[in-house]
Amino acid sequence: MPRALEPAEPILSAEGIPYSPRYDDVYHSTEGGLAQAAHVFLGGNGLPQAWAGQRQFVIVETGFGLGLNFLATWQAWRADPQRCGTLHFVSIEKHPFTREGLAQLHAGLDGLQPLAQALQAQWPLALPGLHRLAFDGGRVVLTLALGDIEQMLPRLAAGADAFYLDGFAPARNTEMWSPQVFRGLARLARPGARLATWAAAGFVRRGLKEVGFEVSRAPGFGGKWQMTVASFRPQWKARRHAPPLPAQWAERHAIVIGAGLAGCAVTERLAARGWRVTLFDGHDGPARQTSAHRAAAMHAHLSADDSLLSRLSRTGNQYALRAWAELAEAGHAVGWHGCGVLQIGEDEAEGEAQRAALAAMRLPEGFVRWMSAEEAAAAHHAGVPRGGLWFPQGGWVAPPDICSAQLAQAGAAVTARFGCRVAAIARVDGQWQALGQDGEVLASAPVLVLANAHEAQQLLPQQHWTMRRVRGQLTTLASAQVDALGGWPDCVVTGAGYLLPRTADGAGRVGSSYDADEGPLVEQPAVHAANLARLSGMLPRQADAVAAIDPATLSGYVGVRTVTHNRLPLVGQVPDEAAALAQAASLRGAHLRDLPRMPGLYAALAYGSRGLTWAALGAELLASQIEGEPLPLESDLADAMDPARLLLRALRHGHTG
């Protein structure tokens, strides 16, 4: 479990230099942070010349601090006519400043104020994990890894072209200069990757040399006579798992099958990277099946042990909010209602478990805090039976609006083939083909993404995906029925079910069932009755009024979710099951990266009831994998969603018959 992040304080030394009392050290030389960044890190890595003409360039930094190295690098990138197509800057920070602290310390950066203010505007809460921020139309991407370097560095999935080593002095911040850190840097280093640091201590140079860097001295900055520069040129040639290289696609064209939340998000993320996308869906428009309902809530999951689900949902929620904000800023109607979400336990025992999780995690109150029943009633008209977790960033949205905004943002890069069902897929001469009912080729591309939920199994049967369909029914209460209840919350409330604030016409929505997919897909009065029971449990003061509602008079929405055995989605490159099973004996001790994959075939499936949480993050993950970019989440979280994860389990346990 990650330790709670302790933000840094904006304190100045007697000389007016940002200072850390925690480490008793300053953040940069007295000669100036930007000048130090230019001499040590840009100059020491041969920048900007090293990125000239590259499609992408990846820098990994240890110690983000004030962000001066990032800002100086961004400024140099902007000023360089030979700049790389996309600049990725990945930085680890254990003690991030708050947004207000950054603004205070950036006040004197006259020439960099526009960049500094753009960084401050997107600055995340101090939440453990990865945070991806995009600038300059997505061509400059900052991935912040907030947490201990011992935890975060091994979880980075990236291939680095350059390293900035910028922790506090080794005598004061030993964990940033350990052999474990040097090994972690070598794991990420692409062939010939360069490294620079102001530190010139002998053990630093020796440690880098031991892991494969050729190390030399260079003139230092300010009061330091020397600094260290290096390039990754190990004597050994083979690495079991080499870091990803920039992908080389002969044609940047992808087929995406399925135009729900998953498929539309993938389409937009690929289009943002300059890809042409052919989007297929058998219905007459986007978001016509599971994503069709107009009442979806989103909030994070919280657990005392910070489980995979908790970490994934936290990262997914934060990324989705940023992605939707960018769509809204581009002029697209997203319709996000950030009213907040109150999650109450189903009973007192669950409420105590919530309190225990909150105390264990110690997350910022801007992300989650406790709200008493009294406060919920006074502030949000929510007559709940007990207090619960308040997620101020939570809310609700109509998924079709998200899908429409994403396709509008993709613009001319997408060719939408609605009303066109793909009957089969095939790989011919290095291209994936989408085939129609009569075997005709509807489209051909080097990359194909399956984003069509359970229907993917019809196109590509996989015995280790274990997807199943779960029915969900939502109940709508008319305005008069809501009025008769005598009160309705103005926030989302979740517990045994969930309810959403009233719509513009006064209606209320309550959900949702989670039943086996059996029989015709039609609304059932018995399920409406069950939803009313859920409503009574969440708002017990209105239970008598709820009991007066005849379920037979109600309407709503019914749909089918696709879920996996553990309710985590399938996102990533599709495994080659046949090839893996043929090599079962040799793969018994394999890792996910050892398994054979189907070239150019990817999945974004089984989002279940958390489509809002998974879709944007899953799309960014897929697009990053396709391009060979740093991943937007920790490697163990990507592994938790890998479409090959159950195949790997079967291979390890010998269950391949």
Swiss-Prot record:
Known function: Catalyzes the last two steps in the biosynthesis of 5-methylaminomethyl-2-thiouridine (mnm(5)s(2)U) at the wobble position (U34) in tRNA. Catalyzes the FAD-dependent demodification of cmnm(5)s(2)U34 to nm(5)s(2)U34, followed by the transfer of a methyl group from S-adenosyl-L-methionine to nm(5)s(2)U34, to form mnm(5)s(2)U34.
Stretches of the chain forming a coiled coil according to its record: none
UniProt cofactor(s): FAD
Region of interest (FAD-dependent cmnm(5)s(2)U34 oxidoreductase), residue spans: 257-657
Reactions mediated catalytically: 5-aminomethyl-2-thiouridine(34) in tRNA + S-adenosyl-L-methionine = 5-methylaminomethyl-2-thiouridine(34) in tRNA + S-adenosyl-L-homocysteine + H(+)
Protein name as annotated: tRNA 5-methylaminomethyl-2-thiouridine biosynthesis bifunctional protein MnmC
InterPro entries, per database record: FAD-dep_OxRdtase, FAD/NAD-bd_sf, MnmC-like_methylTransf, SAM-dependent_MTases_sf, tRNA_MAMT_biosynth_bifunc_MnmC, tRNA_MNMC2, tRNA_S-uridine_synth_MnmC_C
One Pfam match: DAO
MF terms (GO), sorted A to Z: flavin adenine dinucleotide binding; oxidoreductase activity, acting on the CH-NH group of donors; tRNA (5-methylaminomethyl-2-thiouridylate)(34)-methyltransferase activity
GO cellular-component term (any): cytoplasm
UniProt-annotated location(s): Cytoplasm
Keyword set includes DNA-binding: no
Family of this protein: In the N-terminal section; belongs to the methyltransferase superfamily. tRNA (mnm(5)s(2)U34)-methyltransferase family. In the C-terminal section; belongs to the DAO family.
Gene coding for it: mnmC
EC number: 2.1.1.61, 1.5.-.-
Record key words, sorted: Cytoplasm, FAD, Flavoprotein, Methyltransferase, Multifunctional enzyme, Oxidoreductase, S-adenosyl-L-methionine, Transferase, tRNA processing
Keyword Ubl conjugation tagged: no
Source species, domain of life: Bacteria
GO biological process annotation, one example: methylation
Region (tRNA (mnm(5)s(2)U34)-methyltransferase): 1-233
